[in-house]
Amino acid sequence: MSNQLIYSGKAKDIYETADDEIVLISYKDQVTMLNGAHKEMIEGKGSLNNQISALIFDRLNRVGVSTHFIKQLSETEQLNKRVAIIPLEVVLRNVAAGSFSKRFGVKEGQALDEPIIELYYKNDALDDPFINDEHVSFLKLATDEQIAYIKQETHRINAYLKEWFASVGLTLVDFKLEFGFDKEGMLILADEFSPDNCRLWDNAGRHMDKDVFRRQLGSLTQAYETVLERLRALDQ
């Protein structure tokens, strides 16, 4: 299949298809940290992320969450609706970890009384700064109603996935979401949901996400394979 490249990102390439409203997503083996400043190629990582994200998005579609996901094509490719992405990273935290622990001096691993949502302006040149609702309004990134909907959907997604992951012995520590508008102007969930953009800990406290790479804790693909195997077993 010969498709024109639309966009090449850190972890995925996006290609046109014969349908203007559908894009082909190809997952890469590249893994990055420090907002892309450090990069490595890890064989099999793209395939694992594609399969995990496809499985999770299919689940979300089935429980009524509107997403861009259409279907998985191969181990590394999937079809998605074409979406105009809002330049916001929506982070939900269930447990203190990573930058949250550093910013607020909270011990990593402390469960939060209630899930906390944070917003980041998706802008590589500015290093994706932490912003609030007023900043979003000033920058005209989204309306108050759209932000309210995004937060509502993020909490709904969290409630479902937290329980689902817990059923296979994984704690959903935190995750990042992105939203955008489809051709009808409907605000839907986009991007991916994989161990690249969430934190997962097993019942022994072992990291099962990209922190394995960031902190040099062992085999990244082995951790991702474990996540995929557990989710697949539950989905059968």
Swiss-Prot record:
Which keywords accompany this UniProt record?
ATP-binding, Ligase, Nucleotide-binding, Purine biosynthesis
Q: Which cysteines are joined by disulfide bonds?
A: none
| Top EC class for this record | ligase
Q: Which transformation does this protein catalyse, written as a reaction?
A: 5-amino-1-(5-phospho-D-ribosyl)imidazole-4-carboxylate + L-aspartate + ATP = (2S)-2-[5-amino-1-(5-phospho-beta-D-ribosyl)imidazole-4-carboxamido]succinate + ADP + phosphate + 2 H(+)
The secretion signal range is none
Q: What is its EC number?
A: 6.3.2.6
Q: Please report which protein family the annotation says this sequence is part of.
A: Belongs to the SAICAR synthetase family.
Q: Name one GO molecular function term.
A: phosphoribosylaminoimidazolesuccinocarboxamide synthase activity
> NCBIfam families from the xrefs?
purC
Q: Sorted alphabetically, which PROSITE patterns does this protein's record hold?
A: SAICAR_SYNTHETASE_1, SAICAR_SYNTHETASE_2
Put simply, this protein is called Phosphoribosylaminoimidazole-succinocarboxamide synthase
PANTHER family for this protein: MULTIFUNCTIONAL PROTEIN ADE2, SI:DKEY-6E2.2
Q: Which InterPro entries match?
A: SAICAR_synt/ADE2_N (IPR028923), SAICAR_synt_PurC (IPR033934), SAICAR_synth (IPR001636), SAICAR_synthetase (IPR050089), SAICAR_synthetase_CS (IPR018236)
Query: Biological process (GO) annotations?
Result: 'de novo' IMP biosynthetic process; cobalamin biosynthetic process
Pathway as given in its UniProt record: Purine metabolism; IMP biosynthesis via de novo pathway; 5-amino-1-(5-phospho-D-ribosyl)imidazole-4-carboxamide from 5-amino-1-(5-phospho-D-ribosyl)imidazole-4-carboxylate: step 1/2
State the superkingdom. Answer: Bacteria
